[in-house]
Design a protein with these regions (language model features):
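Helix-breaking motifs and short loop linkers at transmembrane-helix boundaries and internal kinks
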Residues: 50, 82, 103-109, 303-305
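Conserved MFS/SLC helix-loop-helix module at the cytosolic interface between two early adjacent transmembrane helices
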Residues: 69-105
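Cytoplasmic helix-loop-helix junction between adjacent transmembrane helices
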Residues: 113-151
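A membrane-interface helix-boundary motif in multi-pass transporters
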Residues: 168-180, 368-388
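C-terminal transmembrane helical hairpin of 12-TM major facilitator-type secondary transporters
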Residues: 283-329
């Protein structure tokens, strides 16, 4: 991997640096909402398009598979282009993919549109992190990453509930229309405010030293750790909304409250879990949270007709613990690779996250069936498999060699 020759601040004015990061966070927000919105719209889409759970799972997994593959392929050529030009082209492709979702007349074309969105979205995420690496000195890079990553929590708190409101009142296409308009506005803001990288771009996402990365058994264990962690999560998440509506007396227009409450709590707990990992050891905290998450996973996937308030409480506990594993878990991964290989390793690991998410949702879709009256059956079996994946991630994480950060 080419090492940077200097680590000087790109922005001389701290205000300009913060505006740059807020712009990236806003662009990331549109991508996260686009990725997340399909899952809580499951009940509406399955009814409107007569989708089986397997067909819906394919639609969710198509996005993540496409993002994973595109993320790997883009690492080969992305660093040959000036960052701003590359981001504007890729973001426009993402916008067009979102527009295709809004225009899709049937499930087959919606599936193709999701593949387009996922492909451009996966490259866009790589570019966001590359821009941060190019423009922000190492001393402030962690805080910069944290600011941009808040897009995930904000998407859960505001973006997904608003999208569900639009879909419940104006049809499933309206969230994609709103996203297209909002993203197009962000494109023009980026055209004006996103700076050109005047110095050579750092190779933050290229598959440099590819053979060295794949030649180390510890790296393969780390990839398996990521697959178990993300695959177990996405066996459950895409079907929560559909399960609550079909089996638990939760109405479609009540679903936004689940995501608002879950996102609000995770906005605070994610940082807290990360701090616990720094204080008590990354693997130790990851193992604690993972063991604590097994119970909520099993309870949620065997949830009875207990109504809205019980569903909100269960969703909050589930989201806090399942997402809470990611803070110490992802930090743990950075300890297994030497610095000169870290860029390529993390690029491959990000692609593995996407592929594992797609594999988890696709596998669960093959297991779940609709019973009498549209009720979900065998979601409990999915819960047991997800619990096994969580336990497997603990075993795999124990072999990564970190005991105290």
């Amino acid at each position: 991997m080419n090492a940077p020759t200097q680590d000087l601040p790109y922005f001389q004015n701290p205000k300009h640096e913060r505006n740059f990061l807020l712009l990236l966070a806003a662009m990331q927000f549109t991508h996260v909402v686009d990725f997340m919105i399909l899952m809580p719209m499951g009940p509406l889409l399955m009814k409107t398009m007569s989708l089986t759970p397997a067909a819906f799972g394919s639609m969710v997994s198509a996005y993540t598979f496409s993002a994973g593959i595109a993320g790997i392929l883009s690492a080969i050529f992305l660093d040959r282009f000036e960052r701003k030009k590359a981001m504007l082209v890729v973001y426009m492709g993402f916008i067009l993919g979102t527009l295709l979702c809004a225009l899709a007349p049937n499930a087959h074309l919606l599936l193709l549109a999701r593949i387009v969105c996922g492909g451009f979205g996966g490259v866009m995420v790589a570019l966001v992190f590359a821009l941060i690496g190019d423009a922000i000195p190492m001393a402030r890079r962690g805080a910069a990453m944290g600011l941009v990553m808040t897009a995930f929590s904000v998407a859960s708190i505001a973006g997904v509930p608003l999208g569900l409101y639009l879909s419940n009142h104006f049809g499933w296409k309206m969230p994609f229309v709103a996203l297209t308009v909002g993203s197009l506005l962000m494109w023009f803001v980026a055209l004006r405010l996103l700076p050109r990288m005047r110095r050579p771009a750092l190779i933050t996402g290229a598959l440099a030293d590819f053979g060295a990365i794949l030649g180390k058994p510890i790296h393969w264990r780390a990839f398996a750790f990521t697959f178990a962690m993300m695959g177990s999560t996405f066996m459950v998440i895409p079907y929560i909304s559909s399960y609550f509506v079909a089996n638990s007396n939760v109405a479609n227009d009540e679903l936004p409250w689940l995501f608002f409450a879950g996102g609000l709590f995770t906005f605070f707990t994610l940082r807290w879990f990360g701090a616990l990992g720094d204080r008590h050891g990354l693997f130790r905290v990851f193992a604690w949270i993972s063991l604590a998450a097994v119970g909520p996973v099993l309870l949620l996937t065997h949830f009875g007709a207990w109504g809205l308030y019980a569903a909100i409480a269960m969703t909050v506990v589930f989201m806090v613990l399942v997402s809470g594993r990611s803070a110490p878990g992802m930090a743990l991964l950075t300890t297994v690779v030497e610095p000169r290989l870290r860029g390529g390793f993390m690029s491959l690991n990000t692609a593995m996250q996407q592929i594992a998410s797609g594999a988890g949702s696709f596998a669960a879709g093959l297991i779940i069936v609709e019973g009498a009256g549209g009720r979900f059956e065998r979601y409990g079996l999915v819960g047991w498999l997800a619990a096994a994946g969580i336990l497997a991630s603990i075993w795999l994480g124990a072999g990564l060699g970190e005991t105290k950060k």
